[in-house]
Design a protein with these regions (language model features):
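N-terminal anchoring/stem segment of glycosyltransferases
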Residues: 2-92, 115-116
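A generic fold-level signal
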Residues: 6, 100, 122, 179-182
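Short, solvent-exposed loop/turn segments at secondary-structure junctions
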Residues: 19-23, 65-68, 88-90, 127-129, ...
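Conserved glycosyltransferase catalytic-site signature
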Residues: 39-43, 101-105, 184
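Short His-Asn-centered micro-motif
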Residues: 61-65, 103, 123-125, 147-148, ...
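A short, glycine-/small-residue-rich helix N-cap motif at loop->alpha-helix starts
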Residues: 93-103
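GT-A fold catalytic core of metal-dependent nucleotide-sugar glycosyltransferases
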Residues: 104-156
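Conserved catalytic core of nucleotide-sugar-dependent glycosyltransferases
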Residues: 133, 137-197
Length: 198
């Protein structure tokens, strides 16, 4: 597929994937309404991003499904892009905890390689954007921005990650520093750094 030239300088993506029998958020008690619950969240995230950002920033729902008509109509009426991207990368077994969360990386890969933006960002679907991304884009000129989940040493999961990293790369720990544990809830970077990241 040839790359599409983007008319705007940045894109804010809300990725959403659905695969039957794959694990997703632990807060979804009613699996039969999973798509509906997530689509409502996606609409709130996309609409708030659109409201607070200027016309130089595109907002997109990136998904592997055809959104139900009621949500598609809402998004399209607010000039929010709907980008279809198959879940063909970073796809682990459906039993894997948070298996669908890795779709964010897949969506980022597809949009990066199919659209030519200066800046790329993705966020979880359960967010409300409260201001413009212009300052984020400026910071992306020098940095990759990620969300620090603030796991302390009291968190067993973090202890296991540190143990594995220490075994793999002892020099990383030689000065007593502990690496920051980043979550996948937020990512933003310029094009060059996104290419390195992905």
């Amino acid at each position: 597929m040839s790359k599409q030239t983007a008319s705007n300088r940045g894109i804010i993506m809300i990725p959403y994937a659905y695969l039957v029998n794959s694990n997703t958020g632990v807060n979804i008690a009613n699996r039969s309404k999973q798509v509906d619950i997530y689509m409502k969240n996606c609409c709130v995230a996309c609409l708030s991003a659109k409201k607070y950002n200027d016309s130089d920033t595109d907002v997109a729902l990136v998904t592997n499904i055809d959104p139900p008509k009621e949500y598609r109509d809402i998004l399209e009426s607010h000039k929010i892009k709907i980008i279809h991207a198959d879940f063909d990368l970073f796809n682990f077994s459906g039993e894997y905890t948070w298996a669908l969360a890795f779709y964010k990386l897949c969506a980022l890969h597809h949009v990066l390689h199919e659209y030519d933006y200066d800046y790329y960002a993705y966020l979880d679907s359960d967010v409300f954007i409260q201001s413009s991304f212009n300052n984020i884009w400026t910071e992306c000129d020098a940095h990759i921005l990620l969300y620090d989940i603030n796991h302390g040493l009291q968190v067993k999961h973090y202890q296991h990650i540190l143990s594995e990293m220490r075994d793999f790369m002892p020099s990383l720990f030689s000065n007593g520093n502990l690496p920051t544990h980043y979550g996948g809830e937020f990512f933003a970077a310029n094009r060059a750094n996104t290419l390195i990241f992905i």
